[in-house]
Regions:
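Sec-dependent signal peptide recognition
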Residues: 2-10
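Short, conserved catalytic or interaction motifs in soluble domains
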Residues: 19
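C-terminal motif of bacterial Sec signal peptides marking the signal peptidase cleavage site
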Residues: 15-16
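Lipid interaction determinants
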Residues: 22-112, 121-334
Length: 334
């Protein structure tokens, strides 16, 4: 069961990247997106000179910050050393991936939530990042001076300033202050993006989903999967073996969500009853065939789609070496 949950957690995001073009009529279309219903991936410019609709397209994408260092980064010895891996914006959400080097060795951390474009006189002055705590959105960081430039050689560069409004330790990210000025390269979108019309599986798949049912050949159902999050191995000296016990200090998740982006990112979240995340994981996904009926997760997990629309997603996994099969059912989250 533990191995299953690891695969499930490491497979399944909340990053929603598709929008009907009709919602962005005021933005000039890019001819390169003529056959796609996905948000424009070619937008550029100074966000401070753009409307909210324009700025949303400009920041849309996965921005690799791993080669950039903040000019103002703190060097506190009492906190872990942290660096940005990437920050990705979708139409409504963002995911920030961090590398953390602490006393117990390297690990990764992720911050996910909604963002807001703040305007003055019709132009965007800042982008605010929020994180859900006990069901409330907390303003954790502010981005300003955002500029995206399309390079003559292809691709896009971005520069921006970020200021953290809270101590990251308040959301269990034990890092020194990451505020400062950064530069970033935009990661390429998945090839299927440019041909993702509204009837394509790619367009239907790229959104935020919540698991509504699960069943496998071992007899487990969704409630077992959620409970498994709080199970721990404990040694029984009488029996001389390890058994699974429920951690009394653990909050059993209420729901499980996944978000798939058109830049090949997935975000998985286990959520408490208030809708706030207990755990966030990120990774990559790709299509396994041209028909877009199979997909890979982290190059080692295959899902087989049986039903897919903009509101419902059903798929199954099978293990070639065993008789194990698991069926998943998700509904889209607005």
């Amino acid at each position: 069961m533990k191995n299953f949950l690891i695969h499930l957690i490491s497979f399944i995001l909340i990053i929603s990247c598709s929008k009907d073009k009709g919602e962005n009529d005021e933005v000039v279309a890019d001819d390169r997106m003529a056959n796609s219903a996905i948000t424009n991936i070619y937008a550029s410019g100074k966000v401070s000179e753009q409307t909210a609709a324009e700025a949303k397209q400009t920041i849309f994408g996965k921005w690799d910050v791993s080669g950039s260092s903040s000019k103002n980064m703190s060097s506190s010895k009492s906190l872990s050393e942290c660096t940005f891996n990437f920050i990705e914006f979708t139409d409504k959400s963002y995911i920030m991936s961090l590398s953390i080097t602490g006393p117990d060795g390297p690990e990764s951390g992720s911050i996910f939530g909604n963002y807001a474009l703040i305007e003055a006189d019709g132009l965007v002055t800042q982008v605010r990042l929020y994180f859900s705590v006990s069901g409330d959105d907390v303003h954790i960081a502010t981005l300003t001076n955002i500029e995206v430039v399309e390079k003559a050689s292809g691709g896009f560069d971005a520069t921006f300033d970020i200021n953290f409004e809270i101590d990251l330790g308040d959301i269990d990210i034990v890092c020194a202050d990451l505020g400062g000025s950064y530069s970033a390269d935009k990661e390429p979108a998945m090839e299927e993006t440019l041909s993702a019309g509204v009837d394509s599986n790619h367009y239907k798949m790229v959104r935020n989903w919540q698991m509504t049912s699960y069943a496998d050949s071992d007899g487990l159902v969704l409630s077992d999967v959620l409970l498994d999050y709080c199970l721990r191995n404990q040694y029984d000296p009488v029996m001389g073996e390890y058994t699974e016990v429920l951690d009394p200090d653990c909050i059993v998740p209420s729901t499980f969500q996944v978000n798939l982006s058109t830049f090949g990112t997935y975000v998985t979240m286990t959520l408490d009853e208030s809708g706030s995340p207990l755990e966030i994981q990120t990774g990559t996904w790709t299509w396994a065939n041209d028909e877009q009926t199979q997909f890979y997760v982290d190059d080692d997990w295959t899902g087989n789609i049986t039903e897919l629309s903009t509101t419902n997603w059903q798929f199954y996994e099978v293990h070639d070496t065993t008789d194990f099969r698991a069926d998943y059912n998700f509904d889209a989250v607005a």
